[in-house]
UniProtKB/Swiss-Prot annotation:
Example of a GO MF term: catalase activity
This protein's encoding gene: kat
Stated family: Belongs to the catalase family.
Catalytic activity of the protein: 2 H2O2 = O2 + 2 H2O
Protein name: Catalase
SMART domains assigned: Catalase
Subcellular location: Cytoplasm
EC number: 1.11.1.6
Organism: Listeria innocua serovar 6a (strain ATCC BAA-680 / CLIP 11262)
Biased composition, class Polar residues, residue ranges: 7-23
Disulfide partners: none
Catalytic residues (positions): H55, N128
Region described as Disordered: 1-24
Length: 488
């Protein structure tokens, strides 16, 4: 016979009646001394934390990453040195713009983030399924997100807002080519690719630095939905991607992704007609070949979504020895913003939560704050100090010195913007079916968008490829010729 398990308060005292509040007699008022009631209501009032300002809707899973090819020639990162090295990971997939309980069928980039619990500390891969972003400079990040979020007056997402922003931000054109393809509505999280979007630096034992981008390729293949297919699913199910991921893992059908690295020698940085460190530019595989790094397998669902999937925090600046951020202007802003939002959302000690806490030992002088439940206990909480048993800095882990490019400090316009060349590359690489889907999806999304905004976007599209602009214009009933004469 199973031993009875008592219901208790958070203080551990058994609860005798969880159905009726304590009152002053049968018809009297409820008593303030009812500790069970007050504790229960007070905790309920505080169950939620602010949702993420982006990537609020997400699903996650635990798993492992196995290094399949040594990366010694590129980096001294410990977990990438030897073939066969296994590293515990937690992955989180998400939509970007919409709220925590929004449909997973909406057109949106998909977040693709992985926390590696390495022997030398945590490493966060923070990416998307799409290989580029809307903007190249972090100073515009709040603006692009505001344009895509609901109107603050109506609380309704409005195409006039984001297409207005896009039309005046021509660097967004390549992202538009991806987002409004069917890849903007993926079939499931198991069938999306992942990209670091940004370039990073890897440094090897000799101190040689290379720029890299990282790519995840799903072993299940990339599968997308048409707008009509997405609408059919949404009519029946808001949670199709989360459900699919959860059920696949529960059934032992563990999703897998191969990780690849693309490498650029710094001496070749100026060899292109674009800036390879610009987040609005893709590194196409035939120009920057893929090298296989390893394989990630997700094999365990979270035990508690709030404590794990909701509370996990990522930052592209969380890197291990042998890795550094690049000079990418968007990345540089994200290095601050991501941990800052976790401190606001979860608390200053969010790294002490089990899902965020490294497996590597933590030894420093950062103490106290709200909820310090993994408090360090030494009486010496300063450094330098003369106590041999206390943690000391280790010069072996000093970051490799990096060359600074440029000699002027100021708000300088990015060099080689090439806002339309990469979008043209994407168009040229699309099949006829992919081009047709892109045009249709844009035309459908322009329902209700003002003509002046459409025309500004069409002028951008014309500079990508006249055929593309003409097909979108035909779909919207706009006479393109009178609006692009000066571009010919």
């Amino acid at each position: 016979m199973t031993e009875r398990k008592n219901l208790t308060t958070n203080q551990g005292t058994p609860v005798g009646d969880n159905q009726n509040s304590m009152t002053a007699g049968l018809k009297g008022p409820t008593l303030l001394e009812d500790y069970v009631l007050i504790e229960k209501l007070a905790h309920f009032d505080r169950e939620r934390v602010p949702e993420r300002v982006v990537h609020a809707r997400g699903a996650g899973a635990h798993g492992k990453f196995v290094t399949k090819k040594s990366m010694k020639k590129y980096t001294i990162a410990n977990f990438l040195q030897e073939e066969g090295t296994e590293t515990e990971v937690f992955a989180r997939f998400s939509t970007v713009i919409h709220g925590q309980h929004s449909p997973e069928t909406l057109r949106d980039p998909r977040g693709f983030s992985v926390k590696f619990y390495t022997e030398e500390g945590n490493y966060d891969f923070v990416g998307n399924n799409l290989p580029v972003f809307f903007i190249r400079d972090a100073i515009k990040f709040p603006d692009v997100i505001h344009s895509l979020k609901p109107d603050p007056r109506t609380n309704i997402q409005d195409g006039n807002r984001y297409w207005d922003f896009f039309s005046l931000s021509p660097e967004a054109t390549t992202m538009i080519m991806y987002l409004f393809s069917d890849e903007g509505t993926p079939a499931s999280y198991r069938e999306i690719r992942g990209s670091s979007v940004h370039a990073f630096k890897w440094i090897n034992e000799e101190g040689k630095t290379v720029y890299v981008k990282l790519r995840w390729v799903p072993k299940a293949g990339i599968v997308n939905l048409s707008t009509e297919q997405a609408a059919q699913i949404q009519a029946k199910e808001f949670n199709h991607a989360s459900r699919d991921l959860y059920e696949a893992i529960e059934n032992g059908d563990y999703p897998e992704w191969d990780l690849y690295v693309q490498v650029l020698d710094p001496k070749d940085l100026d060899s292109f007609d674009f800036n390879p460190l610009d987040a609005t530019k893709d590194w196409f595989e035939d120009v920057f070949p893929y090298e296989h790094v390893g394989t990630m397998t997700l094999n365990r669902n979270p035990d508690n979504i709030f404590a794990e999937t909701e509370s996990v925090g990522f930052n592209p600046g969380v890197l291990v020895r042998g890795m550094l951020p690049s000079e990418d202007r968007l990345l540089q802003g994200r290095l601050f913003s991501y941990s800052d939002t976790q401190r606001h959302r979860v608390g200053p000690n969010y790294l002490q939560l089990p899902i965020n806490s490294p497996k590597a030992p933590v030894a420093n002088n950062q103490r106290d704050g709200y909820m310090p439940f993994k408090q360090q206990t030494s009486s010496i909480n300063y450094e330098p100090n003369s106590y041999e048993t206390e943690p000391k800095e280790n010069p072996a882990f000093i970051e490799q010195e990096q060359e600074i490019r440029g000699d002027i400090s100021g708000r300088l316009i990015a060099e080689k913007p090439n806002n339309f060349g990469h979008a043209k590359e994407v168009w040229d690489r699309y099949s006829d079916a992919e081009r047709a889907a892109l045009v249709k999806n844009i035309v459908d999304d322009w329902s209700g968008v003002r003509d002046d905004i459409k025309i500004r976007n069409l002028r951008n599209f014309y500079q990508i490829e006249p055929e593309f602009a003409n097909r979108v214009a035909d779909g919207t009933g706009i006479n393109l010729e009178e609006h692009v004469a000066d571009l010919k």
